[in-house]
């Protein structure tokens, strides 16, 4: 598996991976209405483009296909998504580990994340602790997530 920095040419593939991952992998934990609010069929490409350009973003590739991506802003892990057919194969750990190392190398003493119900166990296995169970609103729809922290 190849780990590399995100390039703007990756945007469309990342948006497809994000949509499919949310709607397939998180479907056991969230309603269809919640999934649509979290990952609408039509993404705001300019918002995504700007956000990914501002953050340190990595993609994991297998045979030329993006199978995972994640991005961090300092000590905050903003997004981490793994393709539905690559769950449990190490892609998420590869990306998360590299983002944590990047933050640590730049002086961060901790990493925080807002983890979904679906991702909570993944982050707990990586040493993150739940600080708070949260209810957030997306497009008028309430979703549950967890503020989590890992001390380096």
Model-inferred region functions:
Residues 2-16:
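A short beta-loop-alpha structural element at the N-terminal edge
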Residues 15, 19-46:
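Conserved GNAT-fold acetyl-CoA-binding loop/helix
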Residues 43-59, 76:
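A short helix-loop-beta-strand connector motif used in the catalytic cores of GNAT acetyltransferases and
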Residues 56-68:
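Conserved beta-hairpin
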Residues 86, 90-98:
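Conserved acetyl-CoA pyrophosphate-binding loop and the N-cap/start of the following alpha-helix
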Residues 96, 103-116:
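Conserved GNAT acetyl-CoA-binding A-motif
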Residues 112-114, 129-147:
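Conserved catalytic-core motifs of GNAT/GCN5-like acyltransferases
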Residues 123-124, 128:
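Conserved active-site tyrosine of GNAT-family acetyltransferases
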